[in-house]
Structure formats: structure tokens, C-alpha cells
């Protein structure tokens, strides 16, 4: 069953005719994703990659019945693109763009309340249900249909977890990059809740990092959840100094809050299995499942 997306998902691309939109749409089509068109204002009526181009998301949805959109738009315009997709009632919106101003995202976050849209990202690799639908910039070939749900704040560490769970034969049900910005659309808690309710997902890998309290919130949720599944977690930034941003905009220990130590302690107290090295994620999960 997987979560969020599957082979029936109809996907449009905002920023379709740009270099990033073109390249990653080609990759998605080659993977087998059901791409049905794209949006570039001023280029409506043309075709691109043998798909129709529309001026607005409203028009694209009306003509294609799209229920998902991926956004490859520069930071200054990305929030407006998300708002347009929300206004058009697109169900799943994946925003890849890094560097969107925080105040822009606060407006987006407010618009999401009570809407029909789930936003993944921004500043994320996207979402993939292996063998069915790839929305984002992740390398499709490392994925394998399987039983592990993966959710991560880091793109490249997601790929590590994917490659390792593929190598040990477990595969993935769905993989979600929630993004590394301080304000994002979907949290660890929301993703873990969906994975816990999904029959095909037998276990979960959660990859966090320093900054914020998303991992602590996830630990509280896991502790209180009536549904239990094996969960392995890796937290990046154990040696990170305070008050220094480490890559992602949200990866900063500020005011003594958001350290890896705090996150690890919270997750361990919730019964999550911790791996100290990203190289051991797949093996740790396999060993955990073999013990059950």
C-alpha cells in the first residue's frame, strides 16, 4: 500500500521548463512516475518532454486531474508556487527548493492549516515509493520495493539508509525527505504515524539531526502510540558545537536546546534503537528484525 504516493498518483511539475524541472522530470518519467504535465507561466499551450505545459496550477489540475506537484522554482518565488498549489487543492506538494525565506514559509504554514494539501519539504530530496512513483531528486536505482519506511531531515543520509536496506534485502515501502529548514510542511510525527498505520511498512528508520525539537516530539509520540513497530534512528551532529549552523538552516543548537545528546536520550527512552554510525543503519535494522 505504501504511503502518500503510488503508481496511480498523477504528478505535475511547477518550474517544468527550467533546467532543474526538465532534468528531474526526465528522470521521474524514466523511473515510471505518472507525470501528466507541467506549469511555467507564459509558456502555456506548448509541450515539453511530450507533456502539456500550462500557465497555472489551477489549469493544469483541471485538464489533467493531477493530485501531486513537485516544485523546482527559485527561492524568491517558491512560496508563491506552494501557495498556488494549495489554492488549487493539490493533495501532495513536494518542494525541493532550498533557501526559501523563513517568513515566506510562515505564510505557507498558515495557509496549510485546514487545507487539502500535504506539503513535503522544502529543502528536501522528495518522496519515493519504490517501483511505483518518484517525486524529487533522489537516485531511483538504489531503491527496492520492500518493508522499511524511511523518514529523514537529510537527503544524502536518506540515500545511505536506502542503499543499505536495499543491500541487506529489506527494501523500502516509502521514503520521505522532510527537509532541513526550520519551518517545513510535514513533521517526523506525521510521517511516523502514517508508517505505523501502513500494513506494508514493517519497521521504520528515522534520521534526524541537531536543531529544533522535531526528534523529541517524535520520541513523545512513539512512547504514547498504541501501535508499535521496530524503529532505528541515527542523529547527525553528535560533535557539533553550539550556536553554529551545520549545513541545513535548521541544523543549529541554540540556547542549549536541540543537541544530539538530548535527541538520542529522548528516542532511547521511547524504545527506539540507536545507531551511532550512518554506516550501520541497514545492519542495525536487519539485526533488530532478526531478533523479533
Curated annotation (Swiss-Prot):
Keywords (A to Z) from UniProt: Ligase, Nucleotide-binding, Tricarboxylic acid cycle
Active site residues per record: 248 (tele-phosphohistidine intermediate)
Biological processes, Gene Ontology terms: tricarboxylic acid cycle
Repeat is among the record's keywords: no
Residues where substrate binds: 159
EC number, as in UniProt: 6.2.1.5
GO molecular function term, any single one: nucleotide binding
Pathway, per record: Carbohydrate metabolism; tricarboxylic acid cycle; succinate from succinyl-CoA (ligase route): step 1/1
GO CC field: succinate-CoA ligase complex (ADP-forming)
Enzyme class: ligase
SUPFAM superfamilies: NAD(P)-binding Rossmann-fold domains (SSF51735), Succinyl-CoA synthetase domains (SSF52210)
Binding site for CoA: 17-20, 43, 96-98
SMART domains according to UniProt: CoA_binding (SM00881)
Reactions mediated catalytically: succinate + ATP + CoA = succinyl-CoA + ADP + phosphate; GTP + succinate + CoA = succinyl-CoA + GDP + phosphate
Subunit structure: Heterotetramer of two alpha and two beta subunits.
Role played: Succinyl-CoA synthetase functions in the citric acid cycle (TCA), coupling the hydrolysis of succinyl-CoA to the synthesis of either ATP or GTP and thus represents the only step of substrate-level phosphorylation in the TCA. The alpha subunit of the enzyme binds the substrates coenzyme A and phosphate, while succinate binding and nucleotide specificity is provided by the beta subunit.
Family to which the UniProt record says this protein belongs: Belongs to the succinate/malate CoA ligase alpha subunit family.
Name by which UniProt lists this protein: Succinate--CoA ligase [ADP-forming] subunit alpha
Naturally occurring in which organism (per UniProt): Rickettsia typhi (strain ATCC VR-144 / Wilmington)
Amino acid at each position: 500500500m505504501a504511503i502518500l504516493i503510488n503508481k496511480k498518483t498523477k504528478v505535475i511539475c511547477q518550474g517544468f521548463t527550467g533546467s532543474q524541472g526538465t532534468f528531474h522530470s526526465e528522470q521521474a518519467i524514466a523511473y515510471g512516475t505518472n507525470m501528466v504535465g507541467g506549469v511555467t507561466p507564459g509558456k502555456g499551450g506548448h509541450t515539453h518532454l511530450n507533456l502539456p505545459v500550462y500557465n497555472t496550477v489551477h489549469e493544469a489540475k483541471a485538464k489533467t486531474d493531477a493530485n501531486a506537484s513537485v516544485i523546482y522554482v527559485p527561492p524568491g518565488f517558491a512560496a508563491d508556487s506552494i501557495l498556488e498549489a494549495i489554492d488549487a487543492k493539490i493533495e501532495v506538494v513536494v518542494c525541493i527548493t532550498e533557501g526559501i525565506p523563513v517568513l515566506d514559509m510562515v505564510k505557507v504554514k498558515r495557509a496549510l492549516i485546514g487545507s487539502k494539501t500535504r506539503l513535503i519539504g522544502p529543502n528536501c530530496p522528495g518522496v519515493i515509493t519504490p517501483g511505483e512513483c518518484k517525486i524529487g531528486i533522489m537516485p531511483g536505482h538504489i531503491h527496492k520495493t520492500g518493508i522499511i519506511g524511511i523518514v529523514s531531515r537529510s537527503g544524502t543520509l536518506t540515500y545511505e539508509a536506502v542503499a543499505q536496506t536495499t543491500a541487506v534485502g529489506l527494501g523500502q515501502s516509502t521514503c520521505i525527505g522532510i527537509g532541513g529548514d526550520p519551518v517545513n510542511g510535514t513533521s517526523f510525527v506525521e510521517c511516523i504515524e502514517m508508517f505505523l498505520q501502513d500494513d506494508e511498512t514493517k519497521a521504520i528508520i528515522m534520521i534526524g539531526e541537531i536543531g529544533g525539537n522535531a526528534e523529541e516530539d517524535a520520541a513523545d509520540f512513539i512512547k504514547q502510540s498504541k501501535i508499535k513497530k521496530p524503529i532505528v534512528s541515527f542523529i547527525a551532529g553528535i560533535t557539533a558545537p553550539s550556536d553554529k549552523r551545520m549545513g541545513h538552516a535548521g541544523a543549529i543548537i541554540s540556547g542549549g536546546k536541540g543537541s544530539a545528546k538530548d535527541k538520542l536520550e529522548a528516542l532511547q527512552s521511547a524504545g527506539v534503537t540507536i545507531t551511532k554510525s550512518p554506516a550501520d543503519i541497514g545492519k542495525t535494522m536487519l539485526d533488530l528484525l532478526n531478533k523479533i
